[in-house]
């Protein structure tokens, strides 16, 4: 299995406006090819740090004090949970019910994770953030499980959307004023689709 941050071909994207969706978006399409930004435990931990799910001290404990087997187990748990979250997001977008298996997966992680909530300042106010403790292997995924439960309990499901580009697999939580966001980002998909549409119109009507 490929491990190590150096193997990443693309930087992490944080365009989902929600931790669960940003985690799902570590799988993306690059030049028409499915690409996984998580190649091993080091990548997973790096993402958790960048997403403010764990701090650098916890990350150092995992990468310097955990054995290879424990690191691999954490990575596999993360990938499995990501698969659960992707299915959950797809069902929300399709207006389908969430399967009990997803709830079981979320609760399983929450039940095994020591930690505590903290009040964190953010732009325009405050938010509550779960601070996990790295003593337990499952503890590193606790903030993601907490975010998933928050999305299901407090989020507006109608604002969970998949990018309007059929070739894109990224999800986002629409926080725009009128909730009219269609693209994962203008840079990745929005501008390209607009340019393509303009080109097609010019072909169909050269006088434009």
Map each language-model feature to its residues.
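Short helix-coil boundary/hinge micro-motifs
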Residues: 1-159
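Cys/His-clustered metal-coordination modules, chiefly Zn-binding fingers
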Residues: 127-208
